[in-house]
From Swiss-Prot:
HAMAP family, sorted: ATP_synth_delta_bact
Biological role: F(1)F(0) ATP synthase produces ATP from ADP in the presence of a proton or sodium gradient. F-type ATPases consist of two structural domains, F(1) containing the extramembraneous catalytic core and F(0) containing the membrane proton channel, linked together by a central stalk and a peripheral stalk. During catalysis, ATP synthesis in the catalytic domain of F(1) is coupled via a rotary mechanism of the central stalk subunits to proton translocation.
GO CC term, one of those recorded: plasma membrane
Family: Belongs to the ATPase delta chain family.
Record's subcellular location: Cell inner membrane
Name listed for the protein in its UniProt record: ATP synthase subunit delta
Gene that specifies this protein: atpH
Membrane topology type: Peripheral membrane protein
Classification of source organism: Bacteria, Pseudomonadati, Gemmatimonadota, Gemmatimonadia, Gemmatimonadales
Pfam families in UniProt: OSCP (PF00213)
Primary location class: membrane
Annotated InterPro entries: ATP_synth_OSCP/delta_N_sf (IPR026015), ATPase_OSCP/dsu (IPR000711)
Source species of the chain: Gemmatimonas aurantiaca (strain DSM 14586 / JCM 11422 / NBRC 100505 / T-27)
Keywords, sorted A to Z: ATP synthesis, Cell inner membrane, Cell membrane, CF(1), Hydrogen ion transport, Ion transport, Membrane, Transport
Length: 185
């Protein structure tokens, strides 16, 4: 697990560095989209993933391939960033860097993502109302990501970063049971 935490920290550092470069180029959105495309390609193309992971292929060779594939399609500094990742043997962190980049970019724009668990599918109006209430409660623009879990019985469970707001019927019934001194039936 420590390697995962260390990988996240390293990914965040690279994401911060790329965001600084992207802001200097006045294109944080565009660079984020490019990074996401590269990350998706790595995640979805087994051959590309194997190529980048292979210790038998020199970093210089990988950089040349990146340059030929992306050279005229991406900003020079973006390509240099990817080549530096390859040189530092961090190319397999690109998907994690993309996620961290998006999180940092959104946070700077006052946008947070919330995991919203509901007992049943929500309609568009209900989803909009939940997003508006969360935005009002957090003072930020909330982008909800819905998941259905019938075991919560009703209500919602919201996770924004490390904060969990449990308004589920299951929790409320559990609290009532404890207050009444009852045990679980």
């Amino acid at each position: 697990m420590a390697a995962g935490v260390q990988g996240e920290s390293v990914a965040r550092n690279y994401a911060e560095a790329l965001l600084v470069l992207a802001r200097k180029a006045d294109d944080a959105e565009g660079w984020g989209a490019l990074l996401r495309q590269v990350a998706d390609a790595i995640n979805n193309d087994v051959n590309l993933s194997r190529f980048l992971e292979s210790p038998r292929i020199a970093a210089e060779q990988k950089s040349v391939v990146l340059s030929k594939a992306l050279g005229d399609k991406v900003p020079h500094l973006f390509l240099r960033f990817l080549q530096q990742l390859v040189k530092n043997r961090r190319q397999m962190l690109i998907p994690a860097i993309a996620t961290e980049y998006e999180t940092l970019r959104d946070a700077a724009s006052g946008i947070v993502h919330a995991r919203v668990t509901v007992a049943r599918e929500t309609g568009d109006e209900e989803a909009k109302m939940i997003a508006e209430r969360l935005s009002k409660a957090t003072g930020k623009t909330v982008v909800p990501h819905f998941a259905v879990d019938p075991s919560i019985l009703g209500g919602v469970v919201v996770r924004v970063g490390d904060t969990v707001m449990d308004g589920s019927l299951r929790r409320k019934l559990g609290m009532l049971r404890r207050r009444m001194g009852g045990t679980r039936a």
